[in-house]
Amino acid sequence: MTLPLGASPTPHDAAALHQRLLARGIARLDDEAQLAALGAGGDALVLFLEDPVRVPESWDVAVVLPEVLAGLARAGRVVAAGFVPPELGRRWQARFGFRLWPTLLLLRGGALVGAIEGMRDWAEYEAQIPVLLDSPVQERRVALPVAAPAGERGCG
């Protein structure tokens, strides 16, 4: 499958990146209520963007996401979609446990199913997204900070 990429705006324009997604029917998620509403009835792909000046791959995934959604629709799978702007994404990053930007999360009923971190080849999206859609929700994980007692070194 080839992607009609077209001309991308300059990566220095985060507002243009957001407009590109909005023009393709992908909702901007600015708070918990919007995030919860997006996937309340089923599956939702949520794109966590970073500032495209810092992470230009944000542009790439913003181009790929509408194509992924179109392919899913052709296969009869309708999935809601939204994006989280960088300032909010940084606050929610620990909650969802991803490390790389941009990240595409699959949520089901607001719970995490899985993630695709960073920009990938098209074949990886084609292979991984159907697997995620057929996967169960992940058990909630709690990250606990680990510290060595005073005066001791950690592992090593």
Regions found by a protein language model. Name each.
Residues 82-84:
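General small-molecule cofactor/ligand-binding pocket signal
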